[in-house]
Structure formats: structure tokens, C-alpha cells
Swiss-Prot record:
Record family assignment: Belongs to the universal ribosomal protein uS7 family.
Gene Ontology cellular component terms for the protein in this record: chloroplast; ribosome; small ribosomal subunit
Source species: Thalassiosira pseudonana (Marine diatom)
Localization of this protein: Plastid, Chloroplast
Protein name: Small ribosomal subunit protein uS7c
Alphabetized Pfam families for the sequence: Ribosomal_S7
Gene Ontology BP, a term: ribosomal small subunit assembly
Amino acid sequence: MSRRNISKKRFPKADPTYNSYLVSLLVTRILKSGKKNLAQNIVNSAFDIIKSKTNEDPLVIFEKAIRNASPVVEVKARRIGGSTYQVPIEVSSFRATNLALRWIIQYSRQRVGRTMSIKLASEIIDTANDIGNTIKKKEETHKMADANKAFAHFRY
């Protein structure tokens, strides 16, 4: 076992434009090869597109999308007696938010479109309206956990 101190979890600072911690998490998730300025421009233009399409505050829509995409339970592989079981476990709020962000970005990258900001805006709007691939992924995760409910007593 390590004798060193356990490092504290570091959180990014709030986004300067929207003063939101969630937006800064989104920017760091979109980040590729250290180009943070480009990632910030993508998020800002995506939020402008959301504002023009819905005539609502993009931050409110983004938070609603995160709430809609956050899973409550997930399955984890657990090896017991030579066989591996998919054990359903509850997801912490921090992990649920991170999974939602990861799925939104993953499915916005897979979308067919012109620019990343347009694809990201479309995925956020769809997720806020409870449609799209991100919501399908969440429901699929919940179905997997429901199907393996019999192994819930193997929880750790």
C-alpha cells in the first residue's frame, strides 16, 4: 500500500463566459491536443446556436440535458468463483455528470454535420428534449442494470 498522502480531487475553475463549473468541464472534455482556446470557441458558438434555435438561456438547456443524460445505475464486472457477473451499482452524482458529458460529446462527434459546434448544439438540444443517442445510451445502461438485478447482492 502506498505511504503517500491521498491526493485531493482537483476541480477546474468556473468558465469565465458563463461562470459555470459544468461548462468548464465540457470544455476540458472537448479539448484535443491541449488546444483549450479552440475547445472554448466550439462551446461558445454551440451555446450561441442553442440560444438562436430555442430562444432560451443556453446554460439552462445545457443543465437540463446533463440532468436528462445522467444515469442512476450502471453495471460493473465482478469476478466471483470463476465467472464474471455484471453487478448493478448506484452511480455517484459526480460520475453521473461525467458520464453524461462523455456521452453527449461522443455522440455529437458521431453526428453527420458541418462543424463540431453545430453537432454539439444539436446533441445538447436533443438530450434536453429527451431524444437522441445520448438518451438511448442512458436507457440501455439502465436496462442492463435492470436485467442483472439478480446479482445486486454481489455489490461491493
